[in-house]
Amino acid sequence: MNSGSQPQENPGSQSIAIKATGGGAYKYADLFKERLGIIFDKEDEMDCLVAGANFLLEVVHQEAFTYMGDQKQFVQIDQNDLYPYLLVNIGSGVGMIKVEGEGKFERVSGTSIGGGTFWGLGKLLTECKSFDELLDLSYRGNNRAVDMLVGDIYGGMDYSKIGLSSTAIASSFGKAISDNKEREDYKPEDIARSLLRMISNNIGQNLGRTTPQKLAIVVSPRPYEPHIGI
């Protein structure tokens, strides 16, 4: 598409067809055709997503990883025992898809609280002008300055009877209720970090309740790294 020259409007009757998927393939189809002479050959978004995930899991070495706390560990997937698995697609919202084989899948759940929620609320709560700026800001923050932890309720102790550590989040943004502080007393990076944790935890809880699959695959270009997380 980039030949070094500027694209011209209405380039005549000659058209170029390219594969496209997702909402933009429909939303911008007329614009691309009128301005660039490009016709979108549309492919189903979920078909492409599942096919791509299957390919990565079956072919690419160390494409999958898991997190334990803040530590990332790559894992090897047994291609002979891959299915079924749950594919969690995090975009503006979140879709959860049960994949049972090549071309065999169904959407089993989802939530409207996703990447769009993080960006929308983050834009309202901070002065960030882009998603990447908000994400970078969250990496520098400390959610403990904003979130109410189990230790805040139990005097710094674990609630071991039910398996809750003192560092577990009891209430996202909970300290904003109890602290004698004004809005400007809270650092934007701490707010961004708390928001990211809140949304990520919500997705994880929805995932855990959805289906007892042996393997759950989380895919998202952001806020996660561009690999497949288990």
Where are these regions (language model features)?
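Short beta-strand scaffold segments in enzyme catalytic cores
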Residues: 87, 93-99
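Conserved phosphate-binding loops in N-terminal lobes of ATP-dependent enzymes
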Residues: 1-39
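Active-site nucleophile and cofactor-binding loops and adjacent substrate-binding regions
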Residues: 19-20, 40-50, 88-90, 108-113, ...
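Glycine-rich phosphate-binding loop plus the immediately following alpha-helix
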Residues: 56-58, 100-161, 165, 175
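Short glycine-aspartate micro-motif
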Residues: 15-19, 76-77, 84-89
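Conserved phosphate-binding catalytic cores of ATP/NTP-utilizing and phosphoryl-transfer enzymes
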Residues: 5, 41-85
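Adenine-nucleotide phosphate-binding core of ATP-dependent small-molecule kinases
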Residues: 161-228
